[in-house]
Amino acid sequence: MARYCGPKNRIARRFGANIFGRSRNPLLKKPHPPGQHGMQRKKKSDYGLQLEEKQKLKACYGMILEKQLVKAFKEVVHKQGSVTKMFLERFECRLDNMVYRMGFAKTIFAAQQLVAHGHVLVNGKKVDRRSFFLRPGMQVSLKEKSRKLQSVQESLENKDESSLPSYISLDKGNFKGELLMSPEQDQMEAQLPLPVDISVVCEFLSHRT
């Protein structure tokens, strides 16, 4: 599966936040935006603001690809209910993001690697597709051998269970977590490392799908 391989620190500096949860915060060394002397950008147009919100959302979930963004919007735009809530849920409930939220990996990118390399089980069966969509009641666990990975053990050891959103449960001892319910939009937005206007993203995509 295709994935983003570009410079991640530049993206964090662009948005002024350590959005990827790296232990070495790139903003400590270079707190200004990328570009010569962190030059100030010109005032953005409405299109530019929409584009920025879209880029922020993609970054929050581990550099989601454009085609994945468009596909998710097409899947929900004609359904009954809140389009913005269902759209955001498509990314919040991705397997790689749930692995990260549950604390099996320190960063979203480490979570993507765990899934892609076959370390993760869903309801006891191996799933190596990062974009796999979890539904309420589905359990996420790790293979027996994978539980011995130092990176996994360190990540779980440092995971504060009180920081878990209410729609997720975690059993550290058994290396198992569960998606308990469909999250509300405000709950999902609270988990994002920087604020994103989801309605603006959906408006942007509505003109391009």
Curated annotation (Swiss-Prot):
Domain of life from the UniProt record: Bacteria
Residue span(s) of domain S4 RNA-binding: 93-156
Gene Ontology biological process terms in this record: ribosomal small subunit biogenesis; translation
UniProt entry tagged with the keyword Ribonucleoprotein: yes
Entry keyword set: Ribonucleoprotein, Ribosomal protein, RNA-binding, rRNA-binding
PANTHER family found in the cross-reference section: 30S 40S RIBOSOMAL PROTEIN, SMALL RIBOSOMAL SUBUNIT PROTEIN US4M
Protein name: Small ribosomal subunit protein uS4
Gene behind this protein: rpsD
